UniProtKB/Swiss-Prot annotation:
GO terms for molecular function: glycerol-3-phosphate dehydrogenase [NAD(P)+] activity; NAD binding. GO terms for biological process: carbohydrate metabolic process; glycerol-3-phosphate biosynthetic process; glycerol-3-phosphate catabolic process; glycerophospholipid biosynthetic process. Catalyzes the reduction of the glycolytic intermediate dihydroxyacetone phosphate (DHAP) to sn-glycerol 3-phosphate (G3P), the key precursor for phospholipid synthesis. The keyword Transmembrane helix does not apply. Pathway: Membrane lipid metabolism; glycerophospholipid metabolism. It catalyses: sn-glycerol 3-phosphate + NAD(+) = dihydroxyacetone phosphate + NADH + H(+); sn-glycerol 3-phosphate + NADP(+) = dihydroxyacetone phosphate + NADPH + H(+). NADPH binds at S23, Y24, H44, K118, A151, R267, V291, E293. GO terms for cellular component: cytosol. This is Glycerol-3-phosphate dehydrogenase [NAD(P)+].
Length: 345
């Protein structure tokens, strides 16, 4: 268990620093602080952070949810990183490496880093653990937090379950202790560091496909088939990377996949809906008004599947729609026209 440490800019023990003050980072910080812990929330825009401090709420993304008193708002990265041994990075995947590199000069000798970012490295499709090891070396403990969570429901204190994985069992136990709240927020331990990272990236892509299917008007049968076959693609890619099959039947796999594919709180699903209804990619993204992780994730997962030689027909068709201008309805027709095959393949 982490020892109390008040030797920081705040003069109090800080259980965790959350790096990233978007809707999800803010909701995780709120949830942690509700457990009675002192939590620092850092964001890169001083004006945004000043507004959060003045309002003691994030009215833009989490209306009606007030900040606990123990939540500290910070725009100074050095103070934030130095404040706690444990960092929780919650930023879009395409800036994960940039943000981690910015944190690097301020890391403590005992720093441990967990992330709730879902995605892969842009342009390479590498797992985020490999990005982290390249940037900060292998002397720091790393962990990943993943599962079916919508930011607003988490911030409101509605029941939620999630999983955490790390090669460091002590870090997992400490994260469970800090994050788990038996009344509303359940945290499961998982020992599959690879599979936990992969599930969050692939499900974003499949959610776009589910939205496209519904936008075209294909109905519940088609959506369910797409989710099921999407899970098969996720599992095949995971097997090629050495992940454990059971991970994809858990929170970071099936759980997150079903949530993101079936509820319109999901930006990825709403993005797909717009595409299925005939909007172009740029217009659909603009209407969402926030980062659509699945857009970049599609290219990342497609690149990884090509490199690993794993057949992922749903991912391939969505990639063609997003990056090659293919019509969404034609992509759906091409999926339906594929040759007969056994379900397990």
């Amino acid at each position: 268990m982490t020892q109390a440490n008040t030797n920081n800019a705040y003069g109090k023990d800080i259980a965790m620093t959350v790096i990233g003050a978007g809707s999800y980072g803010t909701s995780l910080a709120i949830s942690l602080a509700r457990n009675g812990a002192n939590v620092v929330l850092w964001g890169h825009e001083p004006e945004h952070m000043a507004r959060l401090e003045a309002d003691r709420a994030n009215h833009a993304f989490l209306p009606g949810v007030d900040f606990p008193e123990s939540l500290i708002i910070e725009s100074d990265l050095e103070k934030a990183v130095q404040a706690s041994r444990d960092l929780l990075v919650v930023v879009p995947s395409h800036v994960f490496g940039i943000v981690l590199n910015s944190c690097k000069p301020f890391l403590r000798e005992d720093s441990r880093i967990c992330w709730a970012t879902k995605g892969l490295e842009p342009e390479t499709g590498r797992l985020l653990k490999d990005v982290a090891y390249d940037i900060i070396g292998e002397n720091y403990s790393l962990a990943v937090l993943s599962g079916p969570t919508f930011a607003k429901e988490l911030a409101m204190g509605l029941p939620t379950a999630i999983s955490v994985a790390s090669p460091d069992a002590e870090f997992v136990a400490d994260l469970q202790e800090k994050i788990h709240c038996s009344k509303t927020f359940r945290v499961y331990a998982n020992n599959d560091f690879i599979g936990m990272q992969l599930g969050g990236a692939v499900k974003n892509v499949i959610a776009i496909g589910a939205g496209m299917s519904d936008g075209i008007g294909f109905g519940a049968n088609a959506r369910t088939a797409l989710i099921t076959r999407g899970l098969a693609e996720m599992s095949r890619l995971g097997a090629a990377l050495g992940a454990k099959p059971e991970t994809f039947m858990g929170m970071a796999g099936l759980g997150d996949l079903v949530l993101t594919c079936t509820d319109n709180q999901s930006r990825n699903r709403r993005f797909g809906l717009a595409l299925g209804q005939g909007q172009d990619v740029d217009t659909a993204q603009e209407e969402i008004g926030q980062v659509v992780e699945g857009y970049r994730n599609t290219k990342e997962v497609w690149m990884l599947s090509q490199r690993m030689g794993v057949e992922m027909p749903i991912v391939d068709q969505i990639y063609q729609v997003l990056y090659q201008g293919k019509d969404a309805r034609l992509a759906a027709q091409d999926l339906l026209a594929r040759d007969k095959k056994a379900e397990g393949k």
